[in-house]
């Protein structure tokens, strides 16, 4: 397992907080109880967001017929939606720090639904860029990141399996949404299909409502300190998880903020002899002051995570992981966007209608996430090794796909793509091992942002290459080569770890 979260520079206050954290009792909902509701909530979020996006190849064909634009331009609609969902990750981290996961996810569900509904009235591809690409993509990002982060907070053991089970929603969603969108487009047209999908997306608000923050526990034998029971934000062992307003004054002890809250508390107590309307006014002011404290604290935590003394970018292994994410995701997204048209070019539409190739990817994707997650949790198996093997299998499949021209051979390659891409369930686990639980929200936001850039540029690039060559072969070859570059960055990480271990041994030998 990684120990590289030690590479991040913490100050002395963080070290003291880490010592205090050891005295905490295990939270009853960690690894059990409501934790499994987090898995269920995240599962449905993946169905509604990632599943719908992986089924956009159906709508891509409809948009080509409706607007008569080039494949490269039309592919930007799907790419914008997928890309923005992931690119906004670091900024959604600010919302999570300030408002909590529950509120962020609920707002995201509303914005995503609005984007789908407005897209039903689009007059051209450029309109879809705004309504579907930007609006629906932003809403998806606001609901997606909290779903991943909350599972990470609620699980300490079996994290890989929990993330694997929750992210299988992508596979189920791809299968279900592909069938659903095909049926809706055939029966009602693509515009009404998007309107109906917008209504379904409101269920993201229900999923967000289930993201209950970890409740504070009464602690015994808490060491005396200037800051009683001070705990780091965003730890699964922290008493603060979703950022309730009532905890704001306890967790921000800066002199100015403390004075503001204390003064208002004193005024409220003195106001008991005042008319009721004065008491209500003091309570409103107190709530506003607590909200101000919370926003300041959330922004400070978010800013320090990226640019402060605890910057994630001081972790060399994490930086190498970011470079991998920049190249990898497009190789997974491109088949979903362009496979329906590839099948049409090969005159395999009849067989594909019986059992779509994207559904094969989706089904094997489900098994891949669960199996790879379970294997990675075995004590004798390294998560890193499982992650690397799956990556090599996926890039090999991408290289082989253009060579297949029959339905059976394409089905085999799609099965390999689906199963090996199950490593996505390991990404939060690997990220958490690299930076620690406290920095998971910010760190995973950066990783999915890098994935988003890859998803944003990949499909339009493949469509542009097709417009020039009238073949998708070169698109897959080039994306496969870029993926190999990303894997080379992954291989840098073990080398860095070996160098660090040798340095430690040399230092220890010198002291002896």
Curated annotation (Swiss-Prot):
Broad class of the protein's primary localization: membrane
GO cellular component: a single term: plasma membrane
InterPro entries, A to Z: MFS, MFS_dom, MFS_trans_sf, Proton-linked_MCT
PROSITE patterns reported in the protein's UniProt record: MFS
Superkingdom: Eukaryota
Subcellular location: Cell membrane
Record keywords: Cell membrane, Membrane, Symport, Transmembrane, Transmembrane helix, Transport
Ranges that cross the membrane: 30-50, 76-96, 105-125, 129-149, 161-181, 193-211, 317-337, 355-375, 381-401, 410-430, 446-466, 476-496
Recorded topology in the membrane: Multi-pass membrane protein
Residues in the Cytoplasmic compartment per record: 1-29, 497-512
GO MF entries: symporter activity
Protein task: Proton-linked monocarboxylate transporter. May catalyze the transport of monocarboxylates across the plasma membrane.
Stated family: Belongs to the major facilitator superfamily. Monocarboxylate porter (TC 2.A.1.13) family.
Official protein name in the record: Monocarboxylate transporter 14
Gene for this chain: Slc16a14
